[in-house]
C-alpha cells in the first residue's frame, strides 16, 4: 500500500501516518526525517544536502526526489509506505509518478486532510504548550510568525496538488476537524 498524505501544517498528517504505520506495518516516510538520515550517514546525496542547508538555501527537488527514490528502494518499503511532506509541489508529484513507474509501482491513495486556518493555529499553540509541559523541545517553526509563513507556502506551493491528484482520480478528501479516531476510520475505509 503506497499512500500520500496531504494537508496544511498542523492538519494531523503525522498523527495519521503513525496510526496507519501501526495498522498496516509499513513505514512512515517523512522528508525531514529522510534528509536528516542521509546527512547523518554522510551519503553522497547527504553531503550535498548538508552543504545546501548550511548555506541557508532550500534543498532542490532533484536532491529530495533522489532521497525519496533511494528510500523507497529499501527493504521495509516492499509492502508500501506512507509519504508525509512529499510531494510538496506539482513538480515533485510528477517526479514521484516517474520514480514509481520506473520501479513498476503506483500510488494506491492520496489523502488530503482539510482543516480551517483558525483550528490549525490553535493546534500549533496547543502542541507548543503540550511539548513545554512535557519538558520537550519545541519545533523552531512552531511560533506564530513561522507558522503563518508555512501556511502561506502551503497555499501557494502545495495546495495545487489537490487539483493534480483530483484530475487523476486519486484524491480522497477528509474533514480533518473531526476526531483523530474518526479520521483514521475513514482513511482505513478508503484503503480497504
Swiss-Prot record:
Q: What does this protein do?
A: Catalyzes the reversible transfer of the terminal phosphate group between ATP and AMP. Plays an important role in cellular energy homeostasis and in adenine nucleotide metabolism.
Keywords tagged on the record: ATP-binding, Cytoplasm, Kinase, Nucleotide biosynthesis, Nucleotide-binding, Transferase
Query: Subunit structure of this entry?
Result: Monomer.
Q: Report the enzyme's class at the first EC level.
A: transferase
Write down a Pfam family by its short name: ADK
Cellular localization per UniProt? Cytoplasm
Q: Tell me the gene name.
A: adk
Catalytic activity, as annotated:
AMP + ATP = 2 ADP
Biological or metabolic pathway of the protein = Purine metabolism; AMP biosynthesis via salvage pathway; AMP from ADP: step 1/1
| Keyword ATP-binding set for record | yes
- One Gene Ontology term from the biological process aspect of the record: AMP salvage
SUPFAM superfamilies registered for this protein in UniProt: P-loop containing nucleoside triphosphate hydrolases (SSF52540)
Q: Write out the similarity annotation.
A: Belongs to the adenylate kinase family.
GO MF, any single term: ATP binding
Q: Where is this region: LID?
A: 126-142
Protein's recorded name: Adenylate kinase
Its Enzyme Commission number(s) read 2.7.4.3
The annotated region (NMP) lies at 30-59
Q: Can you quote the domain comment? A: Consists of three domains, a large central CORE domain and two small peripheral domains, NMPbind and LID, which undergo movements during catalysis. The LID domain closes over the site of phosphoryl transfer upon ATP binding. Assembling and dissambling the active center during each catalytic cycle provides an effective means to prevent ATP hydrolysis.
Per UniProt, ATP binds at 10-15, 127, 178
Q: Where does AMP bind?
A: 31, 36, 57-59, 85-88, 92, 139, 150
| Main localization (coarse) | cytoplasm
Provide the Gene Ontology terms for cellular component: cytoplasm
Keyword flag Phosphoprotein: no
Gene3D superfamilies in alphabetical order: P-loop containing nucleotide triphosphate hydrolases (3.40.50.300)
Amino acid at each position: 500500500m503506497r499512500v500520500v498524505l496531504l494537508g496544511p501544517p498542523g492538519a494531523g498528517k503525522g498523527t495519521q501516518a503513525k496510526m496507519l504505520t501501526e495498522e498496516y506495518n509499513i513505514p512512515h516516510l517523512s522528508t525531514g526525517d529522510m534528509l536528516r538520515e542521509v546527512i547523518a550517514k554522510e551519503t553522497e546525496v547527504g553531503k550535498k544536502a548538508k552543504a545546501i542547508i548550511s548555506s541557508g538555501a532550500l534543498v532542490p527537488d532533484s536532491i529530495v526526489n533522489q532521497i525519496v527514490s533511494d528510500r523507497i528502494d529499501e527493504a521495509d518499503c516492499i509492502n508500501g509506505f506512507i509519504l508525509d511532506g512529499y510531494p510538496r509541489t506539482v513538480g515533485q508529484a510528477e517526479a514521484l509518478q516517474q520514480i514509481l513507474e520506473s520501479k513498476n509501482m503506483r500510488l494506491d491513495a492520496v489523502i488530503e486532510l482539510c482543516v480551517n486556518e483558525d483550528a490549525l493555529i490553535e493546534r500549533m499553540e496547543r502542541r507548543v504548550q503540550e511539548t513545554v509541559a512535557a519538558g520537550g523541545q519545541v519545533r523552531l517553526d512552531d511560533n506564530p510568525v513561522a507558522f503563518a509563513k508555512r501556511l502561506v507556502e502551503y497555499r501557494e506551493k502545495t495546495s495545487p496538488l489537490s487539483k493534480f491528484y483530483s484530475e487523476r482520480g486519486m484524491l480522497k478528501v477528509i474533514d480533518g476537524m473531526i476526531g483523530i479516531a474518526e479520521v483514521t476510520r475513514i482513511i482505513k475505509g478508503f484503503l480497504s
